[in-house]
Amino acid sequence: VAPFPEQFLX
């Protein structure tokens, strides 16, 4: 699992 997915940056 990535710590900063695009969904969160989003």
UniProtKB/Swiss-Prot annotation:
GO terms for biological process: defense response to bacterium; killing of cells of another organism. One of its GO terms (cellular component) is extracellular region. It comes from the Bacteria. It comes from Latilactobacillus curvatus (Lactobacillus curvatus). This is Bioactive peptide 2. Keywords: Antibiotic, Antimicrobial, Bacteriocin, Secreted. It is found in: Secreted. Has antibacterial activity against the Gram-positive bacteria L.monocytogenes, L.lactis subsp lactis and L.curvatus H28, but not against the Gram-positive bacteria L.curvatus CWBI-B28, L.brevis and L.plantarum or the Gram-negative bacteria E.coli and Pseudomonas sp 55. Has no antifungal activity against S.cerevisiae, Penicillium sp BKS-TAN2 or A.niger. The lineage of its organism: Bacteria, Bacillati, Bacillota, Bacilli, Lactobacillales.
